[in-house]
Amino acid sequence: MGRFADRVRGSDPAEIATHGLGGFEGGKLAALLSLVALSLSGYSLWETSLKQADMQVFVPPVIQYAAPYQNSNFEVIAVPVTLTNEGARTATVLSMELAVTDPRTKQTKRFYAADFGRWTMERTRTGAYEPFAPASLAGRSSITRSVLFYTRGTDQKPDQLIRDPGNYSFSLILELAEGADKPAVSFDRALLQYDARAFNEGTLPLYSADWRSASNTKRE
């Protein structure tokens, strides 16, 4: 008891206060670190599991076109499309629609995604295409396919929209199963020259004026 009393009597009040303050500050630091760890864990959970699907659409500088049949309004536009899901949740593409406008006449013709593959008359005769079907894209993943868009019905006019050399305006719209949001990308492509003989076997190219891809992403 004597030794304990001596230790108590010999304790410096300032030293006791310092030790108490140090413990309090240590507790605050531990609480702060725990809060930071919890925030990081929540952010990681959001990014990896909870973030809504975010579909980005990319179209390259060159696409292909053909009007292979006479006395018909059938036209085909081959567009290589890259889809990237920047979200965490799965996105399902139900359909793709392509609207093409001739800025000179203001006429617009609509097309639907029908097949995958490279268009040639030989492949058409043999049916060597993969039919378009709804596709799911997991979070943080991407896919690239060459999509063949065909004229959407006999009511679409004019019979041949793309004929005169010059620019044409395109709008590609995706329908997703997850909601009303429809990712879309608009772009212009130019037909440099027209030669119908190319359609006997293949297609004619249309080019981007600046040789850059188009996308629905916001550039800084």
Give the ranges of each region predicted by the language model.
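N-terminal Lys/Arg-rich, disordered targeting/topogenic segments
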Residues: 1-21
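Low-complexity, acidic Ser/Thr/Pro/Gly-rich terminal tails and inter-domain linkers that flank the onset
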Residues: 47-74
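Solvent-exposed, conformationally flexible loop/turn segments
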Residues: 74, 137-142
